């Protein structure tokens, strides 16, 4: 449908910089996710693309055509909001048909298209109902149907599943992915939910404080975060971070955090010390395992801790451990025997899947 390019886009509200010199390229037919915490500027980006907000500086292009001064109605985009924004006095059929009605589309064609879209979204049986008679999931589908029936060039979706219950949200995610693949419409989806982003997007842009920190496919971002913010934001539970220092023992060099020692390359250590960088070690909860303190075989890549909280999730257990007044998280198999108050030995499974960051800048170093 359309390739969308944002070039050095900035948006200010008074002295507040909501979007700060942001550049993005969204490919034709791509399902692109803007992911970040509340207030990071992702909804403002969506509004700028739609033309609902004016640029402070920069340019926006649709298929190479600058659309900075193009009014919203001329951009041929369809938006779905968190609140769904259905007309309360109209039933579902009338809400879906409304965009065609204002275009003066023939009644017979409107009827045909509404029935087609309703069938696609499995809402044919609720077309006679008013919004107050519909569940959150049904209202979400009606809002989507109203966007689809316009046959826009671009879909802009602003947290459309946030008001849907957890069970239905899982189903709705799958339906949205399938629908986007079928319609082949460039889709830009805003969310603060990293699970939505990881499961739905072809690519993800991580945003914070009006800037993009990293753009890539879900696996790339999970496995190769560029900084501590991305590493801590993407992944559930989030990455564990350990503060420490470099130590030398005979011919060996280690990163040491309390009783945890992780071997590092001498060249890496020398570079860090030369630049006077304070190191942070990052380890994902899935890369840790636990055992009895009595099973300690080596002083390398393990440490002792106390079990603080045990969350049994059915297929696995999330353990919160306490170490030196810090809380860290570990994912272990459901059959693991563990109780609150246990003293345990925590081991790093795979040292090649650990990360080092600059404490001051947050930048990933290795």
Report the location of each language-model feature:
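Conserved hydrophobic segment flanking the Walker A/P-loop of ABC-type ATPase nucleotide-binding domains
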Residues: 24-26
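ABC ATPase nucleotide-binding domains
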Residues: 72-229, 233
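Helix-to-loop junction immediately C-terminal to a conserved catalytic motif
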Residues: 50
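Conserved ABC transporter NBD signature motif
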Residues: 58-66
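Conserved coupling/switch loops of ABC nucleotide-binding domains, chiefly the family-specific signature
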Residues: 56-59, 109, 209, 243
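The feature captures the beta-strand-to-loop junction immediately N-terminal to the Walker
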Residues: 35-37
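Glycine/charge-rich catalytic "coupling/switch" loops of P-loop NTPases
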Residues: 252-308, 336-366
């Amino acid at each position: 449908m359309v390739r969308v390019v944002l070039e050095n886009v900035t948006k200010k509200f008074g002295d507040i910089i909501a979007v700060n010199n942001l550049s993005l390229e969204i490919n034709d037919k791509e399902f692109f996710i803007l992911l970040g915490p509340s207030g990071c500027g992702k909804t403002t980006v969506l509004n700028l693309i739609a033309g609902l907000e004016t640029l402070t500086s920069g340019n926006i292009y649709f298929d190479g055509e600058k659309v900075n001064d193009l009014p919203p109605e001329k951009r041929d985009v369809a938006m779905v909001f968190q609140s769904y924004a259905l007309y309360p006095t109209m039933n579902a059929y009338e809400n879906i048909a409304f965009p065609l009605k204002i275009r003066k589309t023939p009644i017979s064609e409107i009827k045909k298209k509404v029935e087609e879209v309703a069938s696609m979204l499995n809402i044919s049986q609720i077309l006679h109902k008013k919004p107050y008679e519909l569940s959150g999931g049904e209202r979400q589908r009606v809002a989507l149907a109203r966007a689809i029936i316009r046959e826009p060039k671009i879909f802009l979706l602003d947290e459309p599943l946030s008001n849907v219950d957890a069970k239905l949200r899982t189903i709705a995610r799958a339906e949205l992915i399938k629908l986007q693949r079928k319609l082949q419409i460039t889709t830009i989806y805003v969310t603060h939910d990293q699970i939505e982003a990881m499961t739905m997007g072809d690519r993800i842009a991580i945003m914070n404080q009006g800037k993009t920190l990293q753009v890539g496919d879900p696996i790339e971002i999970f496995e190769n975060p560029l900084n501590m913010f991305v590493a801590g934001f993407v992944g559930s539970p989030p990455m564990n971070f350990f503060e420490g220092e470099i130590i030398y023992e005979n011919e060996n060099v280690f990163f040491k955090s309390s009783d945890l020692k992780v071997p590092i390359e001498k060249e890496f250590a020398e570079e860090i010390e030369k630049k006077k960088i304070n190191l942070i070690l990052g380890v994902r909860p899935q890369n840790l395992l636990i055992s009895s303190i009595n099973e300690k075989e080596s002083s390398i890549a393990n440490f002792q801790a106390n079990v603080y909280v045990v969350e049994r999730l059915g297929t696995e257990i999330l353990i919160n451990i306490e170490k030196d007044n810090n809380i860290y998280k570990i994912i272990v198999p459901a059959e693991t025997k563990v109780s609150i108050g246990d003293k345990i030995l925590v081991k790093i499974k795979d040292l090649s899947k650990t990360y080092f960051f600059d404490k001051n800048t947050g930048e990933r170093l290795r």
